[in-house]
């Protein structure tokens, strides 16, 4: 059992090393897009299922509250938090529409959708992306494995941050690190700090 625990740490470290080689440019581009969105008076909507729903909420909380520096709140909404809305849509329509219907109501041109799925094949996240595209929103997709069907929906103006792993747990671990990198870049671009602080 101890070896298995050590192996999990080793695999996680190696996946992060691989991600550090593969992902910085796409993370920087996504952060730049998010800064542009926020400076334009727009907002970021985030969605995912299970652990990815938690990641969407984590990202939203970091923007609405703060990440590491004191700053004004930034507009972000996790679409996975309103149980009344989610269960009403799932009951009356389909679970695949729990995010897309919210995007049709809340999304505006210039907003960004942060779409999170370790497989890239979550039906409701794909529907959310389709809704975002119809609302002239930009998409930042956090994926893993081969990018799944989500990768095929992205256009030149969108960004995919695909973790180089096929293991769901390792992908989720890197997704959290990517979210922290995005928050750090957003904060330091919008609110430059003296590095001495």
Swiss-Prot record:
Functional pathway: Carbohydrate biosynthesis; D-glycero-D-manno-heptose 7-phosphate biosynthesis; D-glycero-alpha-D-manno-heptose 7-phosphate and D-glycero-beta-D-manno-heptose 7-phosphate from sedoheptulose 7-phosphate: step 1/1
Alphabetically ordered keywords of this record: Carbohydrate metabolism, Cytoplasm, Isomerase, Metal-binding, Zinc
SIS domain segment(s): 34-196
Source organism, top-level taxon: Bacteria
PANTHER family found in the cross-reference section: DNAA INITIATOR-ASSOCIATING PROTEIN DIAA, SEDOHEPTULOSE 7-PHOSPHATE ISOMERASE / DNAA INITIATOR-ASSOCIATING FACTOR FOR REPLICATION INITIATION
NCBIfam families per the UniProt record, alphabetical: PRK13936.1
HAMAP family, per the entry: GmhA (MF_00067)
Function: Catalyzes the isomerization of sedoheptulose 7-phosphate in D-glycero-D-manno-heptose 7-phosphate.
The name this protein goes by in its record: Phosphoheptose isomerase
